[in-house]
């Protein structure tokens, strides 16, 4: 199975999980391709990033692999900011193509945990609206150990 692991990471936590997913897929003999989403003009202030997430702004992003036709599955990841996914992920969900009928998994990384369920639900709803079949969702606390993260991933991949 060929999987696109699409994520946005500001501090590195979501990137760490994205790379762990690639490793777990590889250990199962599957092909996982990392796709790191980046806004064209990224706000450097975390507070301003959270404000943009709260206001549901959708920044322009680099045109990184928007067409998913060559993939069987998409794994979509975001940090939780102000009870929402990162704005760049919202843009990606609007602009990606060939998602209909694909298997999908959502994951979030978080600090306090406030808003993680709401964020996963919103990501799942958007993927479903676009025609994907969401088969799993999972969350990772920012200080969660790698072994615990790996165990969660082994159960859903």
Which residue stretches match the model-derived regions?
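Short, glycine-/small-residue-rich phosphate/pyrophosphate-handling segment
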Residues: 105-141
């Amino acid at each position: 199975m060929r999987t696109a692991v699409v994520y946005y990471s500001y501090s590195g936590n979501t990137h760490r999980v994205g790379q762990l997913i690639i490793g777990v897929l590889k250990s199962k003999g599957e092909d996982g391709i990392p796709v790191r989403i980046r806004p064209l003009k990224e706000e450097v202030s975390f507070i301003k990033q959270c404000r943009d997430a709260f206001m549901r702004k959708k920044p322009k992003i680099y045109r990184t692999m928007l067409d998913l036709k060559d993939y069987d599955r998409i794994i979509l990841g975001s940090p939780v900011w102000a009870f929402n996914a990162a704005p760049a992920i919202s843009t990606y969900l609007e602009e990606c193509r060939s998602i209909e009928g694909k298997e999908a998994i959502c994951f979030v990384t978080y600090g306090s945990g406030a808003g993680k369920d709401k964020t996963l639900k919103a990501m799942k709803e958007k993927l479903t609206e676009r025609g994907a079949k969401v088969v799993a969702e999972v969350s990772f606390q920012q200080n969660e150990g790698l072994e615990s993260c790996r165990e969660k991933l082994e159960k859903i991949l």
